[in-house]
């Protein structure tokens, strides 16, 4: 299976390539004071408003510090950005070396000498823990450019 490795500090997360739209450098963010802590803010991606999510916080882990790239993924609620501390890169995953620890993951895979947790984007980003896009500004910005 092809996946995008999303590095977050010393941890690696893998996202199935069919869920990945693109990777971008850290964008200018608009913070949302009333948003859940896992929403770092919103950014404009060529006229489309995309929430940037704290990748480890989605998994119930400590918050990210110093992110510099964003993996933009397709989710049941629309596009979402996963924060990364280094440039995400595509890889071919072999057989899983560990079972899923959470309903939002699909196993653990060996990548070189490291382990990567494969994220189930639909389960992870389709959950009730995320704000509905109805609460966020319009997905397209008229006249933005």
Model-derived regions: residue spans:
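An acidic, low-aromatic, low-complexity terminal/linker signal
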Residues: 1-145
């Amino acid at each position: 299976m092809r996946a995008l490795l999303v590095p977050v500090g010393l941890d690696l997360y893998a996202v199935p390539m069919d869920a990945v739209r693109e990777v971008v450098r850290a964008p200018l963010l608009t913070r949302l004071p009333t948003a859940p802590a896992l929403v770092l803010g919103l950014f404009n991606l060529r006229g489309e408003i995309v929430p940037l999510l704290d990748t480890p916080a989605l998994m119930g882990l400590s918050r990210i510090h110093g992110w510099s790239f964003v993996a933009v993924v397709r989710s049941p609620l629309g596009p979402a950005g996963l924060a990364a501390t280094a440039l995400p890169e595509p890889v071919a995953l072999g057989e899983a070396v560990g079972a899923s620890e959470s309903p939002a993951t699909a196993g653990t895979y060996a990548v070189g000498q490291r382990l990567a947790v494969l994220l189930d984007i639909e389960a992870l980003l389709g959950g009730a823990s995320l704000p509905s896009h109805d609460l966020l500004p319009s997905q397209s910005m008229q006249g933005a450019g």
